[in-house]
Each structure stands twice: as C-alpha cells, then as structure tokens.
Amino acid sequence: MLKAVIVDANAISRGLLNTVLSEGGYEVVGQTHASTQGYALLQKHHPHLICMALEQIEDGHDIVEQIKANYPKTLIFMVSGAIDAATLQAALARGVNGFIVKPFKADAVLKTIKSTILALIKKQQEQAG
C-alpha cells in the first residue's frame, strides 16, 4: 500500500482528501496544516507521495526543493482551487509531479495520482534502456 501525507491549511480539504485517498487504497500516514510539520511527517513516515496545498508550496520555506533534495522518490502533488498556466509552469519547474484541483472529485484525484506514477515508471524504464 502506498503511503501519503496531506498538507493543507483547510481542515475540511484535508479531511476530504484523506477520505478520497484512504478509500482509493492509499495509507494516509499523516496530515497537517503547515509545510514545516508536513516535512516532519515526511521524515518520520517516508511516504510515497505528499499532497500539498498551493499556499504551503509558496510559503517561502522552499519545501519542494527540500523534499526533492532529500526524498527524491517522493511524489509531490499540488492541491489548489485555481491553477493558472504561470502557476503550473512554476510548480513544474520547482519539481511538483502532479496537480489536484479543488473541489475534489474522487475518481479524478485517484486517476491523476495513478497516471503520474505510471508515467514516472515508464520514464524510468526508458532511461534504463
């Protein structure tokens, strides 16, 4: 079972995403409202993926860069109610792997995560030759 951490200042959003992931077969090992606490959960549980609200990604703590440097296999999904092209490009450049749009639709969230994982596996296989 793949492990996940959720970081979002909105408790309702955290709860909904927790339900979607849990019912989708993921083990949510922690959730919090702040990026620094999210990083502590990452250090403790070593999840396969972390879902972070846009606000936590942009809070000035360089959290994406820290995760990519120290946990390069952890997939980062940005969660936001509105993702414009500039935000999307900036997030991809920083190392975000995928995007989850609010309001959540369970099937769309799970499909996004699955397709990102499959694309990463395919890319790794192609690089391995």
Language-model features: where?
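Two-component/phosphorelay signaling modules centered on CheY-like receiver
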Residues: 11-30
